[in-house]
Amino acid sequence: MSHLTMIKTLNLRPFHSASALRKIVITSILGVAVTMSGCSLLSVYKIDLPQGTPITQTQAQKLQVGMNQNQVLYILGSPAIRDTLEPNRWDYIYDYQAGTEARRKGIADVKNASQHLKVYFDNNGIVTGIQGLESLPK
């Protein structure tokens, strides 16, 4: 069989079928969508995530060694942690993570923040020490 007769018997049709073209376009669009889903352009929306109660320098400056537990509760509110293994220490913890909107808008003063204030008491419930004042915003 010569090459010419083989070409005639193959029944080659030009690629004009509309349904085949439609399949290629749909497959291409789906491929691009799947590829783009891994990019940051189509990221998941994240909310601002504040956890705990924020404490300011103004509040912390009202704390003094010699205060009782009720006075500390009045100024700062309930602590985030009252450790059963160390009952003479109260931990005030605040953590903030900026969400999608703050990042997209590029707000300069919105950033992730973390605070950890520790208040120590003696056995009579009187403040003996305060740690973590440097982690509080001004």
Curated annotation (Swiss-Prot):
Domain of life according to the entry: Bacteria
Gene Ontology BP annotations: Gram-negative-bacterium-type cell outer membrane assembly; protein insertion into membrane
Name of a matching Pfam family: BamE
GO cellular component: Bam protein complex
Main location: membrane
Alphabetical list of InterPro entries matching this protein: BamE, BamE-like, BamE_dom
Signal peptide feature range: 1-42
Localization per record: Cell outer membrane
Entry keywords, A to Z: Cell outer membrane, Membrane, Signal
Function: Part of the outer membrane protein assembly complex, which is involved in assembly and insertion of beta-barrel proteins into the outer membrane.
Family: Belongs to the BamE family.
UniProt protein name: Outer membrane protein assembly factor BamE
Species whose genome carries this gene: Psychrobacter arcticus (strain DSM 17307 / VKM B-2377 / 273-4)
